[in-house]
Curated annotation (Swiss-Prot):
It catalyses: L-methionine(out) + ATP + H2O = L-methionine(in) + ADP + phosphate + H(+); D-methionine(out) + ATP + H2O = D-methionine(in) + ADP + phosphate + H(+). The gene is metN1. Pfam families: ABC_tran (PF00005), NIL (PF09383). This is Methionine import ATP-binding protein MetN 1. It comes from Pseudomonas syringae pv. syringae (strain B728a). Belongs to the ABC transporter superfamily. Methionine importer (TC 3.A.1.24) family. Gene3D superfamilies: 3.30.70.260, P-loop containing nucleotide triphosphate hydrolases (3.40.50.300). ATP binds at residues 38-45. Its main location: membrane.
């Protein structure tokens, strides 16, 4: 478990104090995939690097599995960092070393494992990330996705309890991003590894995360289960992320709906309700008519969800709306 207690970070620039992270309290449960999303300058990289003390907090307490890592001396910090792996946006591989040597680097530097055991561990890791045939290649001979897989294997070398991912997919194309995220999900599931990742992409959060924190200007403005946060956003920053992801322009949408008659509502379905024939049932029971103005079906990790924007006319609208609510469908009246 990772706990932040009133942690903050301030940089001193040209004699002025610049806050990068305002006082923050946060908990990441063991075995979770926890996502932190925010635009550039939101403070997410600072927060991530505080976990393994690549950044030193200006105040507050960071506790990992009951240990106060803010109080560790140099030896204690070195020991602690062996329990935390990290992968980076631009891979950070040594160009002059082979794939196998890059993966072996943390074990070689630790200096407490015989070479034969290092070679065995490297072979296991390359098999896990699907690169057994690339052990003797150099980074320049690999694709972006393969380089990131090497980075993941290297991060797992010391058998860490925590894996930190710093914009790990932002330099990859969509197809490669999907395969890397699938690999991270498998690692989380099979190794029971706690993963904390930062990103500016909603799709990354939606695919792999259990919980999410939304950051803006050094503050966590909203956090919780991914479905709760993104299907029912409360803060303006979260709503902007949702609108960007769905490519919604509220002004354009308002103009498009101006000529539409009736009440306009947005329905959000989760789980089994996503595929239930609810609209037809409600229309028959209450006599309302509806037109579908917009809609989508997608998944948040393993959970399907759907959203429909409807124009509702005629019949008993109050009864129809009550029926939606009774069926655990979230309804928002837009007009």
């Amino acid at each position: 478990m990772i706990e932040f207690h009133n942690v903050h970070k301030t940089y001193r620039v040209a004699g002025k104090e610049i806050p990068a992270l305002h006082p923050t309290s946060l908990r990441v449960d063991s075995g979770q995939v926890f996502g932190i999303i925010g635009h550039s300058g939101a403070g997410k990289s600072t927060l991530l690097r505080l976990i393994n003390r690549l950044e030193t907090p200006s105040g507050g307490q960071i506790v990992v599995d009951g240990e106060d890592v803010t109080a560790l001396d140099a030896n204690g910090l070195r020991r602690f960092r062996q329990q935390v792996g990290m992968i980076f946006q631009h891979f950070n591989l040594l160009a002059s070393r082979t794939v196998a040597d890059n993966v072996a680097m943390p074990l070689t530097l630790a200096g407490d494992m015989p070479r034969k055991q290092i070679d065995q561990r490297v072979a296991e890791l390359l098999e896990r990330v699907g690169l057994s045939d690339h052990a003797k290649k150099y980074p320049a001979q690999l694709s972006g996705g393969q380089k990131q897989r090497v980075g993941i294997a290297r991060a797992l070398a010391t058998k860490p309890k925590i894996l930190l991912c710093d914009e790990a997919t932002s330099a990859l194309d969509p197809q490669t991003t999907a395969s890397v995220l699938q690999l991270l999900a498998e690692i989380n599931r099979e190794l029971k590894l706690t993963i904390v990742l930062i990103t500016h992409e909603m799709d990354v959060i939606r695919r792999v995360c259990d919980q999410v924190a939304v950051m803006d200007a050094g503050v966590i403005v909203e956090h919780g289960k991914v479905a709760d946060v993104f299907l029912h956003p409360q803060h303006a920053t979260t709503r902007r992320f949702v609108q960007e992801d769905e490519q919604i322009d509220e002004n354009e949408q308002r103009d498009d709906f101006a000529h539409v008659q009736g009440r306009i509502v947005r329905l959000t379905f989760q789980g089994e309700a996503t595929y239930a024939p609810l609209l037809g049932t409600v229309a028959r029971e209450t006599g309302v008519d509806y037109s579908i103005l917009a809609g989508r079906i997608d998944r948040i990790k393993d959970t399907p969800y759907g959203q429909l924007t409807l124009a509702v006319t005629g019949g008993d609208m109050d009864a129809a709306f009550a029926r939606f609510t009774a069926a655990d469908v979230h309804m928002e009246v837009l007009r």
